[in-house]
Amino acid sequence: MEDSTTKNIKEIYLAGGCFWGIEAYAKKIYGVIETTAGYANGKTENTTYRELHSTDHAETVHIKYDADKLSLKKLLKFYFQVIDPTSINKQGNDRGRQYRTGIYYTNPKDREIILQEISEQQKKYTDKIQVEVEPLKNY
């Protein structure tokens, strides 16, 4: 991971199965400054691992990145390399709603970039991409 001396720090939240795998992968990407594993976009503001089934949060990684070194588009291309975007509520051996795929944004301008990348990725699959795209509600 890079140091955080840059002024152009952006953030995105990525859900893609167990958060430990996504986090470990993201840490190796040039331009990523910081990663944090947590739970996002559930029915309640906060949750715990034991409450996941009732609160409907997704295991998610908060990624801060230097936009001068790494674009959101490029970061999303890396993300799509390590998930199965056509599966619903599962990745690999991990099964359940908490393992769903999702891209959660805090900057409304990111939505268009995300949807463009999904459209681009869809060309690689016959099945429909099932990745949630939503504003971040909670983390």
Residue ranges of model-derived segments:
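Flexible coil/turn and secondary-structure edge motifs
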Residues: 1-139
